[in-house]
Amino acid sequence: MTLFLAGPTGSGKSAVAVELAEMLDAEIVSSDAYQVYRELPILTAAPSPADRERVPHHMVSIIPVQKNWNATEHYHRAMRCMEEIHARGKIAIVTGGSGLYFKFLSHGLSEAPPGDAALRAAFANCSTEALYARLSSLDPEGAASTDASNRRYVERNLEIVLAGGKPLSFWKRNWLTPPRGPGWVISRDVPELDERIAHRAARMMQEGAVEETASLGPCSATAERTLGLALIRSMLRGEISRENCQGQLALATRQYAKRQRTWLKREQWLRKLPASPSDSPRALAERIMEELGH
């Protein structure tokens, strides 16, 4: 059996997943695109050593920052982990905020064309608005389902259309199949989520995100996209103050969470799990247990 737990950054899904895994004697499989990097546990908000001691975690801190990573590689490796978990007679809990990675694990691998380095190089010279306009002209329906402000998704969807010669709907037909298991999405009021994100940004700065960034060697193109990495490097070069850096980190995280909420609204199969400031991770996990009939 596989369970899925989603939610925007800062919603508390990792803590809920740990509580739920303890209750079910389950193991956690991350669907986060950046927690795979060993050298970035603070910036990626990877599970703490204490949480990893409580519950087995997979797909966390498995590769160096010099290595590129993508959703297809993640899918194949995570699926092997899930097969091994099931072979031990245990439940797998998939959680993480990277939409495509999560979607592949819940609904299967898309047959879309692989990444095209030449196209990506050409995209680098274009604005997000220009890329989205081109996607709209080639595949209006696909563009309508694409977040125009999310450059990563705009680039990938345009890449699929150009390299594959077919609209997005053709490649995503496999996603019409039922999910591999039940899923929940943690939802919080936006002001509360924004406050949690502000505390998270402050905590990252206090707990070593600056030192973590300063100690990095060369990074792959994928690792370079880690949220906050460019901001802290700018601070280290003296271009912005520490206070400004923390504020911009919180802002960038809020913007990312907004994009995640937009994507999650389209995932109608996920059951809503409303959360308030008074709800502990354990209380939220207990509500999932009740819905599972435990």
Swiss-Prot record:
Amino-acid positions noted as binding ATP in the UniProt annotation, renumbered to this chain: 7-14
Gene from which this protein is expressed: miaA
NCBIfam families the record matches: miaA
Enzyme Commission code(s) on record: 2.5.1.75
UniProt xrefs under Pfam families: IPPT
Protein name stated in the entry: tRNA dimethylallyltransferase
Function: Catalyzes the transfer of a dimethylallyl group onto the adenine at position 37 in tRNAs that read codons beginning with uridine, leading to the formation of N6-(dimethylallyl)adenosine (i(6)A).
Subunit comment: Monomer.
UniProt cofactor(s): Mg(2+)
Keywords: ATP-binding, Magnesium, Nucleotide-binding, Transferase, tRNA processing
